[in-house]
A protein has these predicted regions:
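Glycine-rich, acidic loop regions that bind phosphate or pyrophosphate groups
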Residues: 1-59
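Conserved beta-strand elements of the Class I
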Residues: 8, 98-100, 156
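Glutamine-centric residue-chemistry signal
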Residues: 9, 105-107, 165
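Acidic active-site catalytic centers that drive phospho-/nucleotidyl reactions
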Residues: 11, 102, 161
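Thiamine diphosphate
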Residues: 17-28, 32-38, 109-188
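Active-site diphosphate/adenylate-binding microenvironment
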Residues: 59-148
Length: 188
């Protein structure tokens, strides 16, 4: 984990603070409440001292993107590379799509290969490793899309065969709740 980083850990449960990594700044509290209190202080610091110059940081990120491009080998046996499938879905999908990912290699491919057009388009369990997360999360995203966006934001689930098997029985829930999610199931 970034050895030079200062870690600010905010958690409502004091037992979680510093559990996986020593926190330089441990804060026990609800993250929403803590951030609402911190934001005005940060804005005041920006007024007094200016915002930090992130030009060097962005140049470094651009260099890494150029130096380590996302690449994959095309199969020679006539099958489709899962990365190609994700890339094609991204290219063809509605730009307002809400993308959901299960846990596994497909999660990394989706993170790297989907082109996001707007904020709040990506739902993933991140590094928590919660296999089976994808389908229930996609159902929830679709219900949210119907309630808040009149269903105008389609939901795509990118999932792997192992992750999908953890909660595949929830397809019945998706059907009963009328959630027309789309699923790309990758068998790698």
């Amino acid at each position: 984990f970034a050895p030079g980083a200062r870690v600010i850990h905010i958690d409502i449960d004091p037992a979680e603070i510093g559990k996986n990594r020593v926190a330089d700044v441990p804060i026990v509290g609800d993250v929403k409440t803590v951030l609402q209190a911190l934001i005005p202080q940060i804005e005041q610091l920006h007024k007094e001292y200016g915002k930090p110059d992130l030009t060097t940081w962005w140049k470094l990120l651009d260099k890494w993107v150029e130096q380590y491009p996302v690449a994959y080998e095309e199969p020679t046996d006539g099958t489709l590379a899962p990365q190609w499938v994700v890339q094609q879905l991204s290219a063809e999908a509605d730009p307002n799509t809400i993308w959901v990912s299960g846990v596994g290699q497909h999660q990394m491919w989706a993170t790297q290969l989907i082109e996001f057009h707007h904020p709040h388009q990506w739902i993933s369990s991140g590094g928590l490793g919660t296999m089976g997360f994808g389908l229930p999360a996609a159902i929830g995203a679709e219900i949210g899309s119907q309630q808040y966006f009149d269903g105008k934001k389609p939901v795509w689930l990118i999932d792997g065969d192992g992750s999908f098997q953890m909660t595949s029985e929830e397809l019945a829930t998706a059907f009963m709740e009328g959630t027309p999610i789309k699923i790309a199931l990758l068998n790698n």
